[in-house]
Amino acid sequence: MILIIGGAFQGKLAYALKAYNLTENDVCDLAVSDPEPGYKCYRHLEALSRRNNDITRLLPLFEDAVVIARQVNGGIVPMDGAERAWRERYGIILQQLAKKSEHVTRVFCGIAEELK
């Protein structure tokens, strides 16, 4: 697994397409659909985690894929308890993915930084 993280609109998808020789047809957009097997790349993991409180059962689907996830750990901590709880769950999921990933890359301003 390859994990690419970064803030919104920082160039994560463009980096993934170029670095891993992917096309738009290789990408499953989790913001608009549930994950399906056979894709080389899954993007918007945060959207899937908002719809589904327990996505850990889906993690094996991502084992041989590039996973693109929005980084949400910066900024102001939300006052809403449900939003804070989601951020905690999502952070734990990202930790699990990072642990299982061969490579972890953070993209900021279109620049890739290898973390693992």
Give a label for each model feature:
Residues 6, 44, 109:
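Active-site donor-binding loop signature of nucleotide-sugar glycosyltransferases
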Residues 1-31:
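Glycine-rich P-loop/Walker A and Walker A-like loops and their local beta1-loop-alpha1 context
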Residues 15, 20, 39-42, 90:
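Sequence-level detector for tyrosine residue identity
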Residues 25-69:
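Conserved nucleotide-sensing/catalytic segment adjacent to the nucleotide-binding pocket
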